[in-house]
């Protein structure tokens, strides 16, 4: 049973304010929706179910019923989900405003309780106070939230989430903010509400309250590519692909954490709802998460034997070689930038190997191959540098004055020559480990400069940020022939 969903359904009928603010897609007529993929809690109705992706941020956080309203916790329209969403530093006053909003939308008094009990008893065999008939009265006010960090901004989506031990495949984690407020004050609020309930329901209310107000915070999760719509992931190989998102907007002039105060002034709240509209944005996929996804896909297709081969062609253009031919049927190769990086990295590595080690054919089995598997995964800095260090050590470097050197006197292509000139100022004949790391980073950074990339895509930006970028024409950062550096 989804307690929050039931509470919205029943309390929606008590006045005009609630009829507008407590409207949920899950309580309305179902409409066709995108297929579900992950298990977790819908941020809109707070029930644990199968989730589909949100049209506002492309992350999986909405159920197939609520998706029809297209609400996102990053919206600018003061719908219930947005008013329950807080950002970054949350103060005691902010939490007091949230509790006041709950008290306004979900009041508990003798009149309300009698009204709901009388409504339930109109049905046959409902003279007893059983929890399934009064689930909407058993929603305590808690400071339980699902939290996520997006590029330095931390969001808290408050609500009443049942069954906290259920499987959670979303990037949101449970955070309890009761210590910022005051446990005793929150206890007093709930004990007062509980006093209006029949004795047979009070125990269930108390159990729910304490279980949701005394839990230990979960460890914050890291957002990764699997948390975004499969439609986006399937098109990452296209350099000019743009993500289409929609956001619900209004003339919301409050600070982010003060949206919940709107329900105190009903006329002003309805005036603001009149300004509600939908804004459409086309944004770039450029970010560390998606870049790492593409580089990992290419890493799985690496043929390390090429670095000991004598092929005259580029690494991705070798055909009819059992050890070096790359399977070009994978969509990751449709991105010419990935091909360029792969070709130049392996052209440079082959020159290093041929300059220092006497290996004559690509069919030979060498220890160096096992370290080549990670040369593209530059986003995992520690693992990547360890891989380069092991490759360097396999080249039998010569040590002089505590510095190790390797030779570099084999032919390379013009692209690699240009990288050498730009990164270290010349085409050298000896290289240190630091030189090798710098050169290989430069080959990748020419197309994917992760040093200046945000971690998550622009779909996780707030409306204010999107509007500023849209004004500067920066929401679509793509061009089929221009690199990051250019």
From Swiss-Prot:
Residues 42-79 are annotated as: Zinc-binding domain. A motif (pLxIS motif) lies at residues 480-483. The keyword Hydrolase does not apply. GO terms for cellular component: host cell cytoplasm; host cytoskeleton. GO terms for biological process: symbiont-mediated suppression of host cytoplasmic pattern recognition receptor signaling pathway via inhibition of IRF3 activity; symbiont-mediated suppression of host cytoplasmic pattern recognition receptor signaling pathway via inhibition of IRF7 activity; symbiont-mediated suppression of host NF-kappaB cascade. It is found in: Host cytoplasm, Host cytoskeleton. The keyword Chloroplast does not apply. Residues 1-81 are annotated as: RNA-binding. It holds the Pfam family Rota_NS53. Keywords: Host cytoplasm, Host cytoskeleton, Host-virus interaction, Inhibition of host innate immune response by virus, Inhibition of host IRF3 by virus, Inhibition of host IRF7 by virus, Inhibition of host NF-kappa-B by virus, Inhibition of host RLR pathway by virus, Interferon antiviral system evasion, Metal-binding, Phosphoprotein, RNA-binding, Viral immunoevasion. Its main location: host cell. The C-terminal region is phosphorylated by host CKII/CSNK2A1. Phosphorylation of the DSGXS motif is essential for host NF-kappa-B inhibition. One of its GO terms (molecular function) is metal ion binding. Residues 82-176 are annotated as: Important for cytoskeleton localization. Residues 317-486 are annotated as: Interaction with host IRF3. A motif (IKBKB-like degron (ILD) motif) lies at residues 479-483. Plays a role in the inhibition of host innate immunity by inducing the degradation of key host factors required to activate interferon production such as IRF3, IRF5 or IRF7. Associates with components of cullin RING ligases (CRLs) including CUL1 or CUL3, which are essential multisubunit ubiquitination complexes, to modulate their activities. Recognizes the host NF-kappa-B regulator BTRC through the presence of a DSGXS motif in the C-terminal substrate recognition domain. Belongs to the rotavirus NSP1 family. Interacts (via C-terminus) with host IRF3; this interaction leads to IRF3 degradation. Interacts with host IRF7; this interaction leads to IRF7 degradation. Interacts with host CUL1 and CUL3. Interacts with host BTRC. The integrity of the zinc-binding domain in NSP1 is important for degradation of host IRF3. This is Non-structural protein 1. It comes from Rotavirus A (strain RVA/Human/Japan/K8/1977/G1P3A[9]) (RV-A).
């Amino acid at each position: 049973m989804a307690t929050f969903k039931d509470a919205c359904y029943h309390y929606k009928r008590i006045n005009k304010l609630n009829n507008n603010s407590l409207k949920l897609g899950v309580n309305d007529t179902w409409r066709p929706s995108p297929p579900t993929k992950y298990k977790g809690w819908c941020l809109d109705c707070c029930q644990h179910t199968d989730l589909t992706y949100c049209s506002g941020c492309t992350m999986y956080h909405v159920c197939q019923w609520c998706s029809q309203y297209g609400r996102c916790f990053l919206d600018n329209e003061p719908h219930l989900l947005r008013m329950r969403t807080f950002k970054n530093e949350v103060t005691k006053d902010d939490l007091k405003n949230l509790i006041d909003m709950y008290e306004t939308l979900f009041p508990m008094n003798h009149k309300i309780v009698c009204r709901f009990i009388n409504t339930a008893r109109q049905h046959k065999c409902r003279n007893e106070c059983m929890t399934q008939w009064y689930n909407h009265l058993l929603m305590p006010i808690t400071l339980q939230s699902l939290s996520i960090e997006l590029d330095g901004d931390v969001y808290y989506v408050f609500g009443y989430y049942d069954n906290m031990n259920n499987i959670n495949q979303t990037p949101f984690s449970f955070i309890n903010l009761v210590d910022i407020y005051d446990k005793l004050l929150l206890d007093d609020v709930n004990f007062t509400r509980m006093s209006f309930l029949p004795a047979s329901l009070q125990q269930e209310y108390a159990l729910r309250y304490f279980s949701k107000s005394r839990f230990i915070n979960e460890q914050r999760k890291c957002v990764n590519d699997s948390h975004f719509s499969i439609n986006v992931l399937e098109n990452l190989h296209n350099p000019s692909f743009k993500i289409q998102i929609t956001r619900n907007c209004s003339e919301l002039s409050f600070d982010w954490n003060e949206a919940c105060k709107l329900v105190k002034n009903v006329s002003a709240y309805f005036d603001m709802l009149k300004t509600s509209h939908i804004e459409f944005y086309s944004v770039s996929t450029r970010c560390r998460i998606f870049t790492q996804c593409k580089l990992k896909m290419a890493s799985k297709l690496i043929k390390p034997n090429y670095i000991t081969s004598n092929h005259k062609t580029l690494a991705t253009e070798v055909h009819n070689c059992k050890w070096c031919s790359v399977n070009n049927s994978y969509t990751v190769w449709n991105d010419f930038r990935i091909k360029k990086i792969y070709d130049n990295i392996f052209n440079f590595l082959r020159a290093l190997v041929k300059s220092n080690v006497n290996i004559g054919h690509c069919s030979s089995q060498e220890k160096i191959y096992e370290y080549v598997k990670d040369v593209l995964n530059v986003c995992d800095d520690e693992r990547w540098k360890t891989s380069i260090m092991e490759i360097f050590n396999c080249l039998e470097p010569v040590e002089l004055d505590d510095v190790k050197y390797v030779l570099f006197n084999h032919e390379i292509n013009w692209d690699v020559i240009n990288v050498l000139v730009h990164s270290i100022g010349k085409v050298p004949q000896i290289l240190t480990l630091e030189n090798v790391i710098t050169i290989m980073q430069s080959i990748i950074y020419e197309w994917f400069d992760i040093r200046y990339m945000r971690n998550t895509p622009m779909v996780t930006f707030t409306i204010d940020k999107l509007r500023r970028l849209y004004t500067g024409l920066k929401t679509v950062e793509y061009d089929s022939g221009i690199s990051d550096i250019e």
